[in-house]
Amino acid sequence: MSEKRRDKRNRILHQGEVQLADGRYRFKYLDNAGEAHYVYSWRLDKNDRTPVGRKKDLSLREKERQIQADLFDQIAANGGNYTVLELVEKYIATKTGVRDSTRAGYQTVINFLKKDPMGKQRIDKVKLSDARLWLIKLQKEKGKSYSAIHSIRGVVRPAFRMAVEDDLIRKNPFDFELATVIVNDSVTREAISREQERRFLKFIQEDWHFSRYYEGIFILFKTGMRISEFCGLTKKNIDFKHRCIVVDHQLIRTAKMEYVIEEPKTESGTRKIPMTPEVEACFRTILKKRSTPKIEPVVGGLSGFLYLDKNGRPMVALHWEKYFEHIVEKYNKTYKEELPKITPHVCRHTFCSNMARSGMNPKTLQYIMGHSDISVTLNTYTHLGFEDAEAEVRRICAG
C-alpha cells in the first residue's frame, strides 16, 4: 500500500490535494468535460487560521465541497469562463426583435461595462455582496443617478438569470430589490395644478414667438398622449368624422439621428382618444397652418406628420422638450410667481390627475392613457392631495 501524502502539519491529504512549497494548498479536479482545473487556498480546513498578511478565503476543502456540488448539478466550472461583459453581450444577442430605443439602451450598458472593472470580472466570482457594493459605488463614487443604475441593473440582472438557467452559476448575485441598496434620488414628475396649467397656456398663447406651439401643447394637456405618440400623428390619425384621435404608433429619433416608426409603448397603447371641441379646433388650426413642404417626409411608410422642423423633417420629442424648457425659462423671467419644471410628460401626468379629480372611471382613464396595468394609472400618474380627499369626502357626505 502506498504511503499517504501529508501536509506540513502531518495531516493526511485527500486525492487531488497537495501542499505547495510556499505553504498554499491546491486541489486538482476534472470538470464534466474532462478538462483539468485548479483551486488554491492558504487553509486546508475551515478551522485553520489564515496566515498573517494573506487574504482571507474559503478553505480548500470548503471549495472542494462547492466543486463537488456543482459537478453533481452540472454547473459549469469557473462560470464557463465568462466575464460579466461577455455574459451581457451573450444575453443581448438573444434579444432579437426589440425596439431601436431598447437596442440603444443595451449598447449604452455594453459601452459602460467595457470601461468598468466589473465588466472584466468572471461571473462565478461575483457574489451578492460584490453586486451590492458595485451599485453603491456607482452612485456614491461615480455619481450615477438611480435611474441610470436601474437601467444598468435592468440588463445585468436578467443576464445573470440566464447564466443560472444555463448552469453557468448557481445563484444570481443581482437578485435583490434595488431600493434596499441605493438611494432613490429620482425626481418625481409631478402634475401641475389647474391654475398653473391655465397660466402656462395663457402665456404661450399670448407670446409672439411661442404661440406657434400653443395648439400642440394644448392637445398634450387635454389628451394625455405620450410625446412620441403625438409626434407620430399624421393627418390620417385625426378622425374628425368620429371626433377621435387614432393612436397606433409612435415616432422615435435614434441616437444615430434615424427616424423610426414603432408600435405604441404597450399593447394597450393602441387606442382611440375622444376629442373635445377645443382639441378638435386645435387640430384644425394645426392643419390649416401647416405649410406643404417641397418633399413630404416619409418615415416607415407614413407621411403627413403634423409638425415639421426647419429642415422639413418631422418634429420629435427633443424638439418639444426644448420648447417647454425655453417657455418656462421665459415665463419665470417675466413673472415673480414662477412655474415649476414643465415637460411634455408633465402634461400627461396633469391630464391623468385632472381626469381622476373629475371622477372619471379608472378603467376608462386606463384606456385613454394607454396603460397596460391599471396600477400604473392609479399609483404613478395620479397626483391627488389632501384637498382632493377633503372635497371627495364632503361630496359624499353631502349626498
Kindly give the residue locations of the regions a language model identified.
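N-terminal DNA-binding module of tyrosine recombinases/phage integrases
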Residues: 20-125, 129, 288-302
